[in-house]
C-alpha cells in the first residue's frame, strides 16, 4: 500500500496519537517510516536554543541533539530496539515548506500529522477542540501525496443519539 510514510513530529504530546497511527500504517504496509522535525528558522538563526530545563545548545549542536532527543522519545514507543525501517530527519526553516520539500524529494506516499489542540475553557480543561494550524493547512493543500491528520481522542465530537423520532 505505502512504501514511504513521513511523520511530522512537532514535540507536542497530542502528536503521539499521530505517531501511533503512522507507526501502525508503516508496519502494516512494511513501509519505511521517516520522522521529520523542522526547527523554525527564527530559532535557527538565533545562534543558540535554551531548553525548558535551562540547557543551552549552540547552533552547531542543535540538530544533532534534537535528533538524539527525537530518537530517544520515539524509539522508546517502539517494541524493536533499533528498527531498521525508521529514520529521523531534522531540518531548519519554515516547517510546512521544509516538510513539502522533503516529501517531494523523497517521493513520500503519505504524510501523517497531528492536529493542533485548543483547550476549551467553557467546557472544562479536559475538552480539546481540534484545530489545523498553518503548517497542517499548507501541507494538506499543497502536498502531492495523501495527508492523514490525526486528532486525539479528546478532540472527537460526541454526538447524542436521539431515539425519539416523532
Walk through the language-model features, giving the residues of each.
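A short acidic, glycine-rich active-site loop
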Residues: 53-69, 125, 129
Amino acid at each position: 500500500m505505502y512504501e514511504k510514510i513521513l511523520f511530522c513530529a512537532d514535540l507536542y504530546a497530542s502528536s503521539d496519537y499521530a505517531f501511533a497511527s503512522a507507526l501502525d500504517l508503516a508496519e502494516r504496509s512494511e513501509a519505511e517510516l521517516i520522522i521529520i522535525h523542522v526547527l523554525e528558522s527564527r530559532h535557527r538563526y538565533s545562534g543558540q536554543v535554551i531548553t525548558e530545563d535551562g540547557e543551552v545548545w549552540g547552533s552547531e549542536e542543535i540538530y544533532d541533539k534534537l535528533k538524539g532527543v527525537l530518537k530517544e522519545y520515539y524509539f522508546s514507543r517502539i517494541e524493536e530496539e533499533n528498527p531498521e525501517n525508521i529514520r529521523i530527519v531534522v531540518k531548519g526553516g519554515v516547517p510546512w515548506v521544509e516538510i513539502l520539500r522533503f516529501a517531494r524529494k523523497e517521493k513520500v506516499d503519505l504524510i501523517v500529522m497531528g492536529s493542533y489542540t485548543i483547550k476549551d475553557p467553557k467546557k472544562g480543561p479536559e475538552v480539546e477542540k481540534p484545530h489545523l494550524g498553518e503548517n497542517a493547512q499548507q501541507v494538506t493543500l499543497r502536498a502531492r501525496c495523501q495527508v492523514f491528520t490525526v486528532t486525539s481522542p479528546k478532540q472527537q465530537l460526541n454526538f447524542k443519539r436521539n431515539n425519539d423520532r416523532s
